[in-house]
Amino acid sequence: MATIRVPNEVPSPAQDSETLKQAIRGWGTDEKAIIRVLGQRDQSQRRKIRESFREIYGKDLIDVLSSELSGDFMKAVVSWTYDPAERDARLVNKILNKEKKKKSLENLKVIVEISCTTSPNHLIAVRKAYCSLFDSSLEEHIASSLPFPLAKLLVTLASTFRYDKDRTDAEVATIEAAMLREAIEKKQLDHDHVLYILGTRSIYQLRETFVAYKKNYGVTIDKDVDGCPGDADLRSLLKVAIFCIDTPEKHFAKVVRDSIEGFGTDEDSLTRAIVTRAEIDLMKVRGEYFNMYNTSMDNAITGDISGDYKDFIITLLGSKI
């Protein structure tokens, strides 16, 4: 379930555009007005506001927000205002364009996250947006930017179009659990069978396969993968893929937790988790967070951030400022 709260009566896109224009006109910026408009509009409404703003004022709202706002608040508002497919395409492009030594494993996990926690239609939209924005296919850019074992996995995951209904086949699950087990025992995590299964089967079928794996071999597949010798980075990305496929809400609960735990805050990761899930399943993420860490996600977040950034994030969490 989503957490954002859209008012019962919403102004027209033209009226919202005027409110935003007034909020950034002259000296100073009315950040609260920006939050009240954009933070309480759904994807379709935000798209219409952006279109209306361009028609009326001849400027891209994204460009205006980027120039008038600053810091983590600006990045969060801009990310939220983008069409989701464009947002994810730009996020992946930023990761792939980093210098080789700066392409950290944590960055690459974001590509896995996008590939394994979004709908088939959204992933297609991301690939289309990528081609349109960057004159390259997402798959080509991955293949040319990363070493073979990692590129092979990420291209497979990013190029999939999964069946999205909940029909499953128990016999297929048993057979493919055995194929996965064999590949792990042979220390072949990049075996074609592994990639074929993870890259073609529906989310529901894969979950059935993971259940069959635990039932037949007495251990979860992610633990078996974790104990497999070989490429540590490949092993880590496979574990993230399995986690995202099996329990996406737990994955994002962990992203939130990791972003605020310890010294300092990883605002980029926190923003990504909240912005990308606020219209999808952030309510479930909130519940999983409590189950996993025995504390309120909202309280943990708000105790770690401040200012306009905090006001915007709590608005996406469903609170009023």
Curated annotation (Swiss-Prot):
Annexin repeats lie at residues 11-82, 83-159, 171-243, 247-318. The modification N-acetylalanine is found at A2. Keywords: Acetylation, Annexin, Calcium, Calcium/phospholipid-binding, Metal-binding, Phosphoprotein, Repeat. SMART domains: ANX. PROSITE patterns: ANNEXIN_1, ANNEXIN_2. Ca(2+) 1 binds at G26, G28, E68. Disulfide bonds: none annotated. Expressed mainly in roots and flowers. Lower in stems and leaves. Ca(2+) 2 binds at I260, G264, D304. GO terms for biological process: response to cold; response to heat; response to salt stress; response to water deprivation. InterPro entries: Annexin, Annexin_repeat, Annexin_repeat_CS, Annexin_sf. The modification Phosphotyrosine is found at Y289. The modification Phosphothreonine is found at T117. Induction: Up-regulated by cold and dehydration stresses. Down-regulated by heat shock stress. SUPFAM superfamilies: Annexin. It holds the Pfam family Annexin. The keyword Transferase does not apply. One of its GO terms (cellular component) is plant-type vacuole. One of its GO terms (molecular function) is calcium-dependent phospholipid binding. It comes from the Eukaryota. A pair of annexin repeats may form one binding site for calcium and phospholipid. Belongs to the annexin (TC 1.A.31.1) family. This is Annexin D3.
